[in-house]
């Protein structure tokens, strides 16, 4: 029987460095990478918030990565842009976004955008964060939008479970769904990568009436 050796922390670190170097949207020359039992920490500097997001996603794509600590700081060249400039542009971006309700608002402090208000669906909150994260001068986005509690369908547990099984990205049979009366969902079970873990959460968010998700899925390569 052939055995496949697990990646060491050194192997994992080198793989993440190569992945960061591979992407033209990331300047990896100022990003530090450390690995500790499958957990990756990114440090150093990036030039924009979208670059920071991209670096985090790239690290999580690497096989063997179980968790990520994103500690890079954004050193933007747009230092002349004030919080007022960013707030004005954020308001315009939210107004243009067709998937963002009028109840979502943006405030800015220290070039960090904080989104507040209410949305009916999780995808609307995600759309709001996506709409503002590329604004010049932004160094961070905090999504504090609350999802309105709705009537959870009696068969929502079965519906989510069926959707997980249908999804070709992972083995949905290994995921258990639990619900509570307040619209909360808990995911338990085993997946093969951080990407699968995230995808399972996205599938669950698609159910009506979901207000929160506790993702307890563990990763086994």
PLM feature spans:
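N-terminal targeting leaders
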Residues: 1-221
């Amino acid at each position: 029987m052939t055995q496949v050796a697990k990646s060491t922390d050194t192997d994992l670190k080198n793989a993440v460095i190569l992945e960061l170097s591979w992407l033209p949207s990331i300047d990896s020359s100022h990003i530090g990478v450390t690995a500790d039992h499958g957990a990756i920490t990114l440090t150093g500097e990036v030039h924009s918030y979208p670059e920071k997001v991209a670096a985090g996603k790239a690290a999580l794509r690497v096989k063997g990565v179980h968790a990520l600590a994103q500690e890079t700081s954004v050193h933007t060249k747009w230092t002349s842009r004030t919080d007022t400039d960013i707030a004005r542009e954020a308001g315009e971006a939210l107004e243009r976004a067709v998937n963002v309700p009028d109840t979502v608002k943006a405030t800015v402090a220290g070039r960090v955008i904080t989104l507040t208000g209410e949305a009916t669906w999780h995808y609307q909150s995600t759309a709001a964060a996506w709409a503002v994260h590329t604004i010049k001068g932004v160094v961070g986005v905090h999504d504090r939008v609350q999802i309105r509690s709705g009537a959870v369908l009696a068969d929502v547990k079965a519906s989510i479970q069926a959707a997980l099984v249908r999804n070709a990205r992972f083995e949905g049979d290994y995921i258990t769904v639990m619900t509570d009366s307040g619209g909360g969902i808990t995911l338990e079970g085993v997946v093969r990568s951080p990407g699968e873990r995230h995808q399972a959460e996205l599938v669950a968010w698609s159910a009506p009436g979901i207000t929160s998700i506790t993702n307890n899925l563990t990763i086994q390569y």
